[in-house]
């Protein structure tokens, strides 16, 4: 039996993390619109957030370590001032209980195509869950689209449950899918990835 793989994860402060996310999103052609560092900083500056990135060595040059997967999450509130987040919260009405509970929104994330299927996204998700529990969050919410079949399958495999489906009548592939996962100590006991975490400076 082979040695279990260790995933190397880095957690970023806001300013540096925003720049790193702007860079890595250039590798994702499937994204409709890529986020700018300024946009990321504006969204996250006034709320608790977590910026995580998985790194791996290049197969053809092991001396080089590159970012291969990322996950950005932040708190959402029942009463939001930001119009986009207020719309999100209104769509979650009846599906998520905000009363006396901290809710974490997994905003953006993905894995570069050459590194998919290797467990990086699971490792990031499990690290995100550990962070969420440590900071008192009770549930993680993710919004995706029906056409991102790989992402939906991964989220299902990671025990995220569908809580709402918004059908797009023009093209069902563009229908919005909302999934969530309740966070507690029992969730951490089911984690499978071996991880190291470092803080970027």
Regions found by a protein language model. Give the residues of each.
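Conserved GNAT acetyl-CoA-binding A-motif
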Residues: 102-103, 132-145
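C-terminal "cap" of GNAT-fold acetyltransferases
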Residues: 167-201
